[in-house]
Design a protein with these regions (language model features):
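Pentatricopeptide repeat
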Residues: 25, 29, 45, 58-61, ...
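Short coil/turn connectors between adjacent alpha-helices in alpha-solenoid helical repeat scaffolds
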Residues: 53, 87-97, 133-146
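Solenoid-repeat scaffolds in large eukaryotic assemblies
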Residues: 42-45, 58-61, 76, 96-100, ...
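N-terminal mitochondrial targeting presequence
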Residues: 1-20
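Hydrophobic packing position at a conserved site in alpha-helical tandem repeat units
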Residues: 17-18, 36, 49-52, 56, ...
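Pseudouridine synthase
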Residues: 245, 249-256, 291, 302, ...
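RNA pseudouridine synthases
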Residues: 153-341, 345-351, 413, 418-420, ...
């Protein structure tokens, strides 16, 4: 896996411009948090948070967060989640563990009166800190273990409430299903019935990493209601001949559940999901099997403790850079009004200036970040990405297939090529989809 350091790119930590030696007092704490958040949102707060460990009470920090955001409760929640999340990066710091627990308790205590409640990120970050603290030798082990269990129970109740009757019905249905103890070979064979590109990259008792095919939705939501399918249809699809032009719109979560793979319950929208990649994007995605691991993964993504690389195929000619000189660099461009940073490097140039293959690493995790940064930051929209490509390069791609038909529907040239989370032993590389090869061979 290639890291940002190997790309030779200087990365920026979104953070407050305040000096690390700045002496924070109870009077200046609101301004301190405000500047950190305004310069880098939660990333900025995570960086400066250690400087307030052991110096202020939970009441002080909650009050300062509301003052810093002028009672914008969404932003105040972001600050508090960032402070709690930062504690997970300092597991051996007893002040950090105690602060996370006290912040959680204080926030819960005022939630009804202030109409300002913790959310699933709060629960996940708090559990991650307390669970880690319970594993350190000492007199507080049992205390933190009990606290972690309490927070996890709260998270589960919160998720069930948000999920409503449909979620409860689904969980009840899954609990009655007979277990399917597939061997590794049987699982691989079962996955291949749905797509040749679908494969397990890593799996243990707590999580699973999948190479998701391009064109397959991760899970069905309100926007994909028409694509929802019944178990009967799902079974029919899995029994169908490979290669059939089948109209069933299968989600990755549907398939994993049908194969009997256990998934966590804390995401009220979709079991197991802790991060997302778009329908048209292929590649590595991790799903949680247990609620405990769900919390830990949410915290890992929240604190930017995950390395993600993408491969993108883009035009050689830029619509904003007349020099068309490109090698490597960084893209510092807001996405959806929020700070976003990516690093990139050209890893292949195709003959006759037809196309470039880029390696992109995201330093933040905004929706459509790579797609926006390629299109608007580099002036090179990803091939087939109709949402951000108003040019005609898609014609060039279609000409390279003898009979594209539906084969390119809901697909574009963006692939999550690698995923690394050191804490959980994840370091995987995902092969590019088979359909990429058909076109890449044509433009060589």
């Amino acid at each position: 896996m290639i890291s940002a350091r190997q790309l030779g790119v200087k990365t920026r930590a979104f953070a407050s411009s305040l000096s690390d030696n700045y002496q924070v007092t109870i009077d200046t704490l609101p301004n301190f948090l405000e500047e950190a958040y305004s310069n880098g949102e939660t990333d900025g707060v995570i960086r400066i948070a250690p400087s307030i460990y052991g110096k202020f009470s939970a009441d002080d920090i909650v009050s300062a967060s509301l003052q810093a955001t002028k009672n914008n409760k969404g932003q105040a929640a972001g600050i508090l989640n960032a402070v709690i999340g930062s504690c997970s990066l300092h597991k051996s710091n007893s002040d950090a563990s105690l602060l996370a627990w006290n912040l959680y308790c204080t926030w819960e205590a005022i939630s009804d009166e202030m109409e300002f409640s913790p959310d699933i990120v709060t629960f996940c970050n708090t559990f991650s800190v307390l669970n880690a603290a319970s594993e350190y030798p000492g007199d507080d082990q049992d205390f933190y273990k009990a606290c972690a269990a309490q927070v996890l129970d709260r998270a589960q109740r919160y998720s069930k409430k948000l999920g409503g009757s449909k979620r409860r019905k689904l969980l009840n249905t899954l609990s009655r299903r007979p277990s399917k103890n597939h061997t590794a070979i049987q699982q691989i064979d079962a996955l291949k019935k749905f797509s040749d590109d679908l494969e397990i990259l890593f799996e243990n008792d707590d999580l699973i990493v999948i190479n998701k095919p391009s064109g397959m939705v991760l899970f069905h939501s309100k926007t994909t209601t028409n694509g929802k399918i019944s178990r009967k249809k799902l079974k029919h699809f899995s029994d169908a001949q490979k290669g059939e032009d089948n109209h069933f719109d299968l989600s990755l979560v549907d398939i994993l559940l049908e194969l009997g793979i256990q998934l966590s319950t804390l995401n009220n929208e979709a079991l197991g999901v802790v991060h997302r990649i778009d329908r048209g994007t292929s590649g590595a995605i991790v799903l949680a099997k247990t609620d405990e691991m769900h919390c830990k993964l949410v915290t890992a993504f929240f604190t930017r403790s995950v390395d993600k690389n993408y491969v993108a195929l883009v035009p050689w000619k830029s619509c904003i850079d007349e020099s068309n000189q490109i090698d490597q660099g960084q893209i510092d461009l807001e996405v959806g009004g929020r700070p976003a940073l990516s690093t990139y490097k050209v890893i292949k140039r195709y003959p006759d200036n037809k196309a470039l293959q880029l390696l992109v690493q995201t330093q933040t995790g905004r929706k459509h970040q790579v797609r926006v940064h390629c299109a608007k930051g580099l002036g090179r929209p990803i091939f087939l990405d109709t949402l951000y490509d108003d040019r005609t390069e898609k014609v060039f791609i279609h000409e390279k297939l003898s009979n594209p038909g539906k084969s390119l529907e809901n697909k574009f040239f963006l692939h999550a090529s690698s995923l690394r989370i050191d804490e959980f032993g994840i370091d995987v590389t995902a092969n590019i989809p088979n359909w990429w090869h058909d076109i890449l061979n044509e433009i060589e």
